[in-house]
Amino acid sequence: ELGPGDRIGVGEKGLMSVEGLLFAKYLMYRAVYWHKGVRAPTAMVKKAVLLALRDGVLEAEELYGLDDAGFFGLLRARARERGFPPFALAEAVLQGQSYPVLLDLPFDGADPRHRALLGLEARLGFEEELAARISARGPALGPLDLIVDIPEPVSFESDGAQAATPAVD
């Protein structure tokens, strides 16, 4: 229906359908995208791409419109051209290998230490610092051996409000 000012709206009869669609979207995120078994491989690929963007190995524009085959083909081509070690993370995911989840903590937005890690650059720096601290006391870890994953908030609201993104067993 058209509302005031030719804005598109949903009438009373369509409200249940829209609510059902939003609830189905939430269930899909909860069951699939937020599941720990999916989060680790997603975080591995994400880290490879973030580092490639940061280091100029990839440009954001190159990633638009790619399907999975095109995306991974681009990463493989750049790995061959430039020998970029972080792309080994994405290749491991393609081979069915995933980092194990060693610690799963709920995100606490009231905790300044958690909020500090929302920025991707800060998170990459924290990962490097944590890997160095662990290496000083135990097994040697490189900067690619550890990933802190904080799922981005996803909006299920029409006004852009953010829904919580819990990890699911």
Annotate each predicted stretch with a short phrase:
Residues 1-169:
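Histidine-centered, transition-metal-coordinating active-site segments
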